[in-house]
């Protein structure tokens, strides 16, 4: 059976038959000796060659021959009698191989004609330009390094099934340049953040992933068991309380980029395993944090994309402009101006209005909710999705901010912000609560809520209280969702597009 050509989709053929044919080729290779050799070392990468010799014409390359050793995956092959071409893709890009029996020998040439798309091949040769001007390697030595047993998706149709792209990310990376670009941008973003933090005298640290008590956020944890210690443990939902212990210990500026785990739903914005960057700075407050976070995100965009003006889902977002700042009620009245100050202070009205939006106000989290928590819930229904431009929502109520410092001037309010862009939360920060007695009282309130059925309420962390009792300097802290930030910078509509291996349901 002949393997499908570039115009005959592999999906239309009997894939099992194709695999069987390739296994037979592998069997023949094994009989000849080492089927998967590991003694070839490339000297150049495709993209570097394309960039370095972009201005070298045919005559210049002939006058000054450049010897190269290149390896990669064969993505296209054209056999034309006594001369053949192959497009080879390495980790940086693509380059063309030119293969003739005169250069590589008749035996190698005959073998090459039987190689398949997806095979890992290597060549030593010299650079030249074809008559059409394409930079190519005139192969003097050609080798098969790794036999691919499964066919690649058809060139023109690609990996059309979106779930298959996530499930078989390795294939998606092979055939989809945009996917590779997304994850390179992610790497540049994180590298930029690390550089920015280092320049601001922050120390990168690592804190535990297994916690005896989950804390630092309102979320449902994953539960596991430590056999050696015979104790229940939790995958961390946030590193916050450990990082603030380090502030107590005298490390005045710390940050961590790492995984958090929350045993909650999956959506275009949520994955149970996700990457956060949290940082804490002594002798700062939430206003300093807002200025600092704004500068950090702006610089990350410039380093990742070369500009602070980005396109997201067909709309422009200018990160160079100062970010907006609104209170919760200001945001509600901006995007839902029908609400009066009196209505937004009326418990019964707010509960009725939330019911109209389909919110179950009988659930434990709302049973004893005050005006501030109800206002926040209404904000989430009316304004949050409309916050396209970078906007800090500030001054959150105490009852939904158990770790944030209370305002000195406004009762019931904390020095807290959340940063929204394109209708989604990107960051959350506040002046840290460093009063151990106030913190203990708030933990007790959280325990009461948990006992009442609120699974996301926090536990009482006695050791953290003990740390605060040693004295924590005035501190500001912030968490930035790396995945959501990368979604923004790469114009990705779902979080799965920026996770190499997102969580999926088990295959049937």
Swiss-Prot record:
<feature type="binding site">
    <location>
        <position position="418"/>
    </location>
    <ligand>
        <name>Mg(2+) 1</name>
    </ligand>
</feature>
<keyword id="KW-0460">Magnesium</keyword>
<dbReference type="InterPro" id="IPR012340">
    <property type="entry name" value="NA-bd_OB-fold"/>
</dbReference>
<protein>
    <recommendedName>
        <fullName>Lysine--tRNA ligase</fullName>
        <ecNumber>6.1.1.6</ecNumber>
    </recommendedName>
</protein>
<keyword id="KW-0067">ATP-binding</keyword>
<dbReference type="InterPro" id="IPR045864">
    <property type="entry name" value="aa-tRNA-synth_II/BPL/LPL"/>
</dbReference>
<dbReference type="InterPro" id="IPR004365">
    <property type="entry name" value="NA-bd_OB_tRNA"/>
</dbReference>
<dbReference type="InterPro" id="IPR044136">
    <property type="entry name" value="Lys-tRNA-ligase_II_N"/>
</dbReference>
<dbReference type="GO" id="GO:0000049">
    <property type="term" value="F:tRNA binding"/>
</dbReference>
<dbReference type="InterPro" id="IPR002313">
    <property type="entry name" value="Lys-tRNA-ligase_II"/>
</dbReference>
<dbReference type="GO" id="GO:0004824">
    <property type="term" value="F:lysine-tRNA ligase activity"/>
</dbReference>
<dbReference type="Pfam" id="PF00152">
    <property type="entry name" value="tRNA-synt_2"/>
</dbReference>
<keyword id="KW-0030">Aminoacyl-tRNA synthetase</keyword>
<dbReference type="GO" id="GO:0005829">
    <property type="term" value="C:cytosol"/>
</dbReference>
<comment type="subunit">
    <text>Homodimer.</text>
</comment>
<keyword id="KW-0648">Protein biosynthesis</keyword>
<keyword id="KW-0479">Metal-binding</keyword>
<dbReference type="Pfam" id="PF01336">
    <property type="entry name" value="tRNA_anti-codon"/>
</dbReference>
<keyword id="KW-0436">Ligase</keyword>
<dbReference type="GO" id="GO:0006430">
    <property type="term" value="P:lysyl-tRNA aminoacylation"/>
</dbReference>
<comment type="similarity">
    <text>Belongs to the class-II aminoacyl-tRNA synthetase family.</text>
</comment>
<feature type="binding site">
    <location>
        <position position="425"/>
    </location>
    <ligand>
        <name>Mg(2+) 2</name>
    </ligand>
</feature>
<dbReference type="InterPro" id="IPR018149">
    <property type="entry name" value="Lys-tRNA-synth_II_C"/>
</dbReference>
<dbReference type="GO" id="GO:0000287">
    <property type="term" value="F:magnesium ion binding"/>
</dbReference>
<dbReference type="GO" id="GO:0005524">
    <property type="term" value="F:ATP binding"/>
</dbReference>
<keyword id="KW-0963">Cytoplasm</keyword>
<feature type="binding site">
    <location>
        <position position="425"/>
    </location>
    <ligand>
        <name>Mg(2+) 1</name>
    </ligand>
</feature>
<dbReference type="InterPro" id="IPR004364">
    <property type="entry name" value="Aa-tRNA-synt_II"/>
</dbReference>
<dbReference type="InterPro" id="IPR006195">
    <property type="entry name" value="aa-tRNA-synth_II"/>
</dbReference>
<keyword id="KW-0547">Nucleotide-binding</keyword>
């Amino acid at each position: 059976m002949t393997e499908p050509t570039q115009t005959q989709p592999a999906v239309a053929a009997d894939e099992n038959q194709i695999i069987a044919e390739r296994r037979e080729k592998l069997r023949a290779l094994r009989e000849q000796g080492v089927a998967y050799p590991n003694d070839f070392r490339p000297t150049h990468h495709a993209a570097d060659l394309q960039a370095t010799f972009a201005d070298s014409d045919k005559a210049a390359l002939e006058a000054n021959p450049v010897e190269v050793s290149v390896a990669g995956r064969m993505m296209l092959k054209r056999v034309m009698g006594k001369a053949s071409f192959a497009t080879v893709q390495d980790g940086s890009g693509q380059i063309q191989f030119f293969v003739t029996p005169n250069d590589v020998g008749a035996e190698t040439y005959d073998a090459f004609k039987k190689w398949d798309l997806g095979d890992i091949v290597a060549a030593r040769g010299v650079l030249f330009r074809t008559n059409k001007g394409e930079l190519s390697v005139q192969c003097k030595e050609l080798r098969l390094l790794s036999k691919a047993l499964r066919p690649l998706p058809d060139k023109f149709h690609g990996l059309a099934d979106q779930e298959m792209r996530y499930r078989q990310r390795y294939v998606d990376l092979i055939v989809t340049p945009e996917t590779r670009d997304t994850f390179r941008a992610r790497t540049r973003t994180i590298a930029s953040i690390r550089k920015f933090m280092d320049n601001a005298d922050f120390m990168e640290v690592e804190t535990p992933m297994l916690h005896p008590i989950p804390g630092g956020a309102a979320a449902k944890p994953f539960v596991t068991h430590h056999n050696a210690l015979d104790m229940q443990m939790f995958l961390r939902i946030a590193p916050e309380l450990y990082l603030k212990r380090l502030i107590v210990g005298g490390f005045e500026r710390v940050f961590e980029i790492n995984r958090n785990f929350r045993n909650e739903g999956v959506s275009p914005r949520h994955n149970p395993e996700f990457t956060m960057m949290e940082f804490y700075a002594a002798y700062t407050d939430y206003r300093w944090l807002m200025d600092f976070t704004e500068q950090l995100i702006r610089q990350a965009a410039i380093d990742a994309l070369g500009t602070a003006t980005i396109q997201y889902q067909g709309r422009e977002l200018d990160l160079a402009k100062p970010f907006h700042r609104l209170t919760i009620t200001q945001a509600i009245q901006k995007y839902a101006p029908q609400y009066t100050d009196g209505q937004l202070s009326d418990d019964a009205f707010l509960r009725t209005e939330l019911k109209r939006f389909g919110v179950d106000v009988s659930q434990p989290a709302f049973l004893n909710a005050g005006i501030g928590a109800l206002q926040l819930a209404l904000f989430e229904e009316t304004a949050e999705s409309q916050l396209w431009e970078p906007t800090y929502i500030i001054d959150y109520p105490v009852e939904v901010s158990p770790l944030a410092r209370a305002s000195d001037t406004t009762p019931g309010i904390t020095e807290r912000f959340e940063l929204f862009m394109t209708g989604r939360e990107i960051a959350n920060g506040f002046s840290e609560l460093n009063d151990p007695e106030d913190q203990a009282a708030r933990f007790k309130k959280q325990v009461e809520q948990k006992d009442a059925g609120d699974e996301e309420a926090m536990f009482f962390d006695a050791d953290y209280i003990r740390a605060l009792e040693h004295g924590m300097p005035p501190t500001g802290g912030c968490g930035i969702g790396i995945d959501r930030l990368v979604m923004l910078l790469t114009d990705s509509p779902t979080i799965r597009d920026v996770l190499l291996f997102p969580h999926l349901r088990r295959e049937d």
